[in-house]
From Swiss-Prot:
The lineage of its organism: Bacteria, Pseudomonadati, Spirochaetota, Spirochaetia, Brachyspirales. Its main location: cytoplasm. Binds 1 Mg(2+) ion per subunit. It comes from Brachyspira hyodysenteriae (strain ATCC 49526 / WA1). This is Adenylosuccinate synthetase. The gene is purA. Keywords: Cytoplasm, GTP-binding, Ligase, Magnesium, Metal-binding, Nucleotide-binding, Purine biosynthesis. Plays an important role in the de novo pathway of purine nucleotide biosynthesis. Catalyzes the first committed step in the biosynthesis of AMP from IMP.
């Protein structure tokens, strides 16, 4: 029996969905514990590409119980659309559970998100405008509507009326917006309620019973450590807690029940939206990586900023999450490069920094200290054993492991489920 957390170590888009999909084969439960429809992940199974935003990647395994935990904010329209899409592809959804404690994302959250981002002007955060921040704001302000509230017509109507009146004051007086219609929202969301009802459950009890029964559980992170509300490059972060601790608070499973934490590391670095990115590339190499890796957002379609692998970021993520090992993804994207670099330290005012700076002014001015490596100039796509990787690829991976002081357990050399090298057994 093992409970394993999969967490992103960079700014998201590391390939967590691929790793979760691969490891889910050995699990009975797969859990999503935070974030919302702002977190896209792509999984390829039998050459069929699945793009998911709310549903755990484990849903692609017909015999797994997939749980959306209390820490997730759920937009019913997106959730039901994903369900319909999977049903069309003959994916079994009968084992899907939604926490009755999860919060409901409403249309006024999306409107506020967009208006607030526009209002920030040059200080914009680069939000996906999916309403995630305003929804978590309502949750923290104790104004939110939970799934359990949506299941009770009278409770939902009362809470919705209060929220609509409050939000319309804000929308009309501050943003000169027409506001939202209570009756229309009530009718729309009560319709969603009946479609959601079969999936709603006390997932905290379900998961803790599964642990007592010695089931294997995989906690699937969304976004990543550097987007964590506390530990990321604040304020250019998300509104939830993608670090390993968030898997516990977002699912109702205590930290002492976790056996293993695996950090997913893309073999290069990418970032979407605003914020410091010390190892960012602005040359032809950066464009090559973007094009070869298809580095465009699953949710927004925005081009991702690309750069060299930043070991300072990953080492910091190892500290924050207490990583037991790392899973390297997208190594194959680097197959054609003549030279590669890893940022192993930051220099500021001619001094090497210890730790990862919280001050974004400093972070935006640091000079990356690089170590250069020879490329391997051959395809890694068909390799399934670590020892059979090109020598230069192994040197690159070994040095990363040394700098971040964390072992490698998995290497992914393609998007397919089978394009995976297991270095250290997880389950």
């Amino acid at each position: 029996m093992a409970s394993v957390i999969i967490v992103g170590t960079q700014w998201g888009d590391e390939g967590k969905g691929k790793i979760v999909d691969y490891l889910a084969e050995n699990c009975e439960y797969v859990v999503r514990s935070q974030g919302g429809s702002n977190a896209g992940h792509t999984v390829v199974v039998d050459n069929i590409k699945y793009k998911l935003r709310l549903l755990p990647s484990g849903i692609l395994h017909k015999d797994k119980v997939c749980v959306i935990g209390n820490g997730v904010v759920i937009e019913p329209k997106v959730f039901l659309s994903e369900i319909d899409s999977l049903i069309e592809k003959k994916v079994n959804i009968s084992n899907l559970k939604i926490s009755d404690r999860a919060h409901v994302l409403m249309p006024y959250h999306k409107i506020l998100d967009e208006l607030q981002e526009e209002d920030l002007g040059e200080n914009k955060l680069g939000t996906t405008k999916n309403g995630i921040g305003p929804c978590y704001m309502d949750k923290s302000s104790r104004l939110g509507i939970r799934i359990v509230d949506l299941m009770n017509k009278e409770t939902f109507a009362k809470k919705l009326k209060f929220n609509v009146e409050l939000k319309n004051k804000l929308l009309k007086k501050l943003y000169n917006h027409d506001g939202v219609n209570y009756d229309e929202l009530l009718k729309e969301y009560l319709g969603y309620a009946e479609k959601l009802r079969p999936f709603v459950a006390d997932t905290t009890t379900i998961l803790n019973k599964a642990i007592k029964e010695k089931k294997n559980i995989l906690f699937e992170g969304a976004q990543a450590t550097m987007l964590d509300l506390d530990h990321g490059t604040y304020p250019f972060v998300t509104s939830s807690y993608p670090a390993a601790g968030g898997a516990c608070t977002g699912s109702g499973v205590g930290p002492r029940k976790i056996d293993n934490v695996i950090g997913v590391v893309k073999a290069y670095a990418t970032r979407v939206g605003e914020g410091p990115f010390p190892s960012e590339l602005f040359d032809d190499v950066g464009q090559f990586i973007r094009d070869k890796g298809g580095e465009y957002g699953t949710v927004t379609g925005r081009a991702r900023r690309c750069g060299w692998l930043d070991a300072c970021v990953v080492k910091y993520a190892s500290y924050v999450n207490g990583l037991d090992s790392i899973a390297i993804t997208r190594l194959d994207i680097l197959d054609e490069l003549d030279k590669l670099k890893i940022c192993v330290a930051y220099k500021y005012n001619s001094e090497i920094l210890e730790g990862y700076p919280a001050d974004l002014d400093i972070l935006s001015k640091v000079e990356p200290v690089y170590e250069e490596f020879e490329g391997w100039k051959t395809s890694t796509r068909d390799i399934r054993e670590y020892d059979k990787l090109p020598e230069n690829a192994k040197k690159y991976l070994k040095r990363l492991s040394e700098v971040i002081e964390t072992d490698i357990s998995i290497v992914s050399v393609g998007a397919g489920r089978d394009e995976t090298i297991i270095v250290k057994k997880i389950f």
